[in-house]
């Protein structure tokens, strides 16, 4: 790790100094009259400087990744406590109400393209460095190539989930002239490219590094398999939704996405196997906390090698009306790089690399926090069962109105998300919901940001099983229920008891299991930048509608999926907004963000009033030039 941070903090500054004097175009990271000299690529240190630069650049986009992947979802409301320190309150409220337009700077995707260009630099110059540096081996280059190919694919994957059709290039961009050559590439076409790219390098990255922070903070084989599972899950949804025309019955299996759903199961298991091996190789003495109990909560036979952090003392602490120990919360969020982690962006107080206070910018109950938690959505996810809501430890830190903490100005008791705060949970007296004592000290600004972890992959597999179901209560339905219950049990105070399950014997149909997966993902990943993406995928899988897609007339516009997603999830606690959301989103294009107006300007026009890179047809409210 010392070598990593030496390169990270010294070489990276040199790379940044060379490359970040950018012109104002969204893909250009070098000034027009200056590109990196060919002599820059002398040895592996030059490659590694650019390699770590890509990770840093992606980490600097964290606020946008949260807005794109989470903000619009059913998990949040604008903070009920209005404060002048909430500088983005008006903007975020517009986004929550689906009032998107191309002048919102949060939809500027340029920073992600900069990370992509760093990846392209590494991939384009690796062979040259290999030829020049005798100490740099072919094996090391192949591992780095696999890692950076996956990182580039992850960046593009964020973009197609956020904007649908995007500009795609696997070449280094160095000038404005090259920008003018770009036209949009369709979402599904880009996804096909990404899957093929990652398929070509799977299993070729490193399994682990000497330091656990590198193992969890750089892309390894377990992260690559998780990424493949995620991309196949999305492609299965896109294919299924485009095969659905008119009115859609989710109880009826649509086989268009079945092959990809099976791939989710294959690569999900591969990711979990790789994580299991990785953790064995690391060992408790080399980075992981000792004294943890790991359980599979009934997964074996459906998914193998599952090791979830158990909260064994939670039930006894709760019954004794005392401070409740929640090791899963402590290890996954407060400490980071847990045994369940597959890939997380690293932030470190010792290296002065913070997350910019982004997590407290969105969550918590301080004066600067912009969001409250939508308790109605969480209650529905718990089966409208208040007892389950109170006894699921995840609600204690993602949707709690019984709290006390530093920085809180609340005089009432709205619900907030404290996932990224330092929390202590105290069950006292007759209070059924433990009181959360939270703090946002300096360490919070240096907590890692999790991209993939074990329960994420497990619930991808549960969704894939639901997709593959062809009859009520078949083996796939039973497998999906087993996985959902395993994830749920870990966080319920009863743990292995019968009351800890969330599914019921009556949950036998494909559409019901897809709904249950979405509910469990809300409970598990609220505040982790995933919820809106999940809802988009759900809507895309349904598709349907009576009108043609505005950009692809061979398929319908997906409006039925949009409407069902709003009715089933977004409406919880927001019934007054339902008709407005449906009117504003219109069709599947309304699920995605607008193209930032300066990026359209950079691409120019093909004729008066016609941009080379057209605006999202739902958010077609642009400044004109």
Predicted regions and their residues:
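C-terminal motif of bacterial Sec signal peptides marking the signal peptidase cleavage site
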Residues: 19-22
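Bacterial signal peptide processing site
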Residues: 24-27
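Short coil/linker segments at helix-helix boundaries
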Residues: 165-187, 238-266
């Amino acid at each position: 790790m010392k070598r990593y941070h030496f390169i990270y903090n010294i070489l990276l500054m040199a790379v940044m100094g060379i490359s970040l004097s950018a012109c104002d175009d969204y893909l250009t990271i070098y000034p027009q009259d200056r590109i990196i000299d060919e002599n820059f690529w002398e040895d592996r240190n030059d490659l590694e400087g650019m390699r770590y630069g890509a990770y840093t650049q992606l980490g600097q986009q964290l606020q946008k990744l949260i807005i794109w992947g989470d903000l619009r979802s059913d998990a949040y409301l604008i903070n009920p406590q209005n404060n002048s320190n909430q500088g983005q309150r008006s903007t975020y409220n517009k986004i929550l109400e689906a009032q998107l337009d191309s002048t919102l700077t949060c939809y500027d995707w340029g920073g992600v393209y900069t990370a992509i260009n760093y990846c392209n630099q590494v991939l384009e110059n690796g062979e040259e460095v290999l030829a020049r540096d005798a100490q740099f081996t072919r094996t090391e280059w192949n591992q780095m190539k696999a890692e950076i190919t996956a990182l580039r694919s992850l960046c593009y994957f964020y973009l197609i989930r956020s904007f649908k059709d995007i500009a795609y290039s696997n070449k280094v961009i160095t000038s404005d002239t090259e920008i003018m050559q770009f036209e949009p590439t369709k979402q599904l076409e880009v996804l096909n490219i990404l899957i093929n790219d990652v398929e070509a390098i799977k299993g070729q990255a490193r399994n682990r590094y000497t330091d656990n922070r590198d193992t969890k903070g750089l892309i390894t084989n377990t992260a690559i398999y998780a990424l493949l599972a995620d991309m196949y899950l999305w492609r299965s949804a896109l294919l299924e939704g485009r095969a659905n025309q008119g009115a859609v019955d989710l109880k009826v299996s649509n086989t268009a996405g079945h092959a990809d759903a099976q791939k989710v199961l294959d690569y999900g298991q591969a990711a979990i196997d790789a994580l299991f091996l990785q953790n064995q190789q690391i060992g408790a003495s080399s980075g992981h906390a000792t004294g943890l109990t790991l359980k599979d909560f009934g997964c074996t036979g459906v998914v193998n090698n599952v090791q979830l952090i158990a909260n064994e003392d939670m039930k006894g602490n709760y019954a004794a009306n005392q401070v409740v120990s929640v090791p899963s919360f402590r290890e996954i969020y407060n400490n980071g790089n847990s045994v369940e982690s597959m890939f997380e962006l690293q932030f470190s107080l010792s290296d002065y690399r913070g997350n910019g206070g982004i997590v407290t910018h969105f969550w918590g109950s301080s004066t600067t926090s912009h969001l409250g938690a939508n308790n109605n959505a969480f209650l529905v996810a718990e089966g409208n069962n208040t007892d389950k809501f109170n006894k699921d430890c995840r609600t204690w830190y993602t949707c709690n109105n019984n709290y006390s903490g530093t920085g809180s100005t609340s005089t009432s008791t709205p619900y907030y998300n404290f996932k990224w705060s330092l929390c202590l949970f105290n069950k006292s007296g007759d209070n059924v919901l433990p009181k959360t004592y939270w703090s946002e000290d300096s360490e919070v600004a240096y907590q890692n940001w999790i991209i993939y972890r074990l329960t994420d992959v497990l619930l991808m597999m549960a969704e894939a099983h639901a997709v593959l179901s062809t009859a009520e209560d078949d083996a796939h339905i039973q497998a999906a229920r087993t996985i959902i219950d395993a994830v749920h049990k870990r966080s319920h105070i009863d743990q292995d008891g019968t009351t800890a399950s969330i599914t019921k014997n009556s949950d036998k149909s494909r559409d019901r299991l897809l709904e249950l997966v979405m509910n469990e993902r809300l409970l598990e990943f609220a505040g982790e930048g995933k919820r809106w993406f999940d809802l988009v995928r759900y809507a895309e899988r349904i598709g349907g509608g009576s009108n043609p897609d505005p950009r692809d007339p061979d398929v319908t516009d997906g409006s039925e999926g949009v409407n069902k997603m709003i009715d089933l999830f977004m409406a919880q606690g927001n019934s007054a907004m339902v008709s407005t959301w449906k009117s504003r989103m219109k069709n599947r294009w309304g699920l995605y963000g607008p193209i930032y107006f300066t990026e359209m300007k950079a691409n120019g026009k093909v004729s008066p009033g016609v941009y080379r890179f057209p605006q999202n047809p739902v958010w077609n409210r642009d400044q004109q030039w």
